[in-house]
Amino acid sequence: MMNKGGRLRKAVRKSIPATFRLFLAFNFFVYGLAKVVIGQFGEVTPEIEAAAGKGFTIAWTFFGYSHVYELFIGFGEILAAVLLLIPRTAALGAVIFMPIIVNIVLINYCFDIGVQDLSTILMVMCLILLWMDRRKFMGIFRQEPIDSRQVMKR
């Protein structure tokens, strides 16, 4: 019979990744839809072209210049969100999510976008998910085969 501490650890070990996956998926789905459906960055106006000096204005104008880039990032966020919601594909979703969120964190800090806290939290959550699934990725770095039963456990 499992003691209370063992049950609690097991529950936490399962609930934290699930909670992180849902939180990341929700945030990326919302931001992805904002880019794909309404255009998060906006269009370049004469006023914005004349403005200089504000990092946020310059960055948003730059990203808004290319609708293709906005759609690419938006669809990437939506794909990562959907994959994070499905337990069998959650690790792949985290892998897709990671370069996107690292880029977002750098942009937020370098251009003072103002949502540094949220983007940093999302990145740390993704890192934790990747760390918890590290056994799934070990085969990439090893020569010997990995037992699939151990990888798919969880």
Curated annotation (Swiss-Prot):
Q: Does the keyword Cell cycle apply?
A: no
Sequence intervals crossing the membrane: 20-42, 62-84, 91-109, 113-132
Query: What is the membrane topology listed in the Swiss-Prot or TrEMBL record?
Result: Multi-pass membrane protein
Q: What is the lineage of its organism?
A: Bacteria, Bacillati, Bacillota, Bacilli, Bacillales
This protein's UniProt keywords: Cell membrane, Membrane, Transmembrane, Transmembrane helix
Give compartment(s): Cell membrane
Q: What is this protein called?
A: Uncharacterized protein YwoB
Instruction: Give Gene Ontology CC terms.
Output: plasma membrane
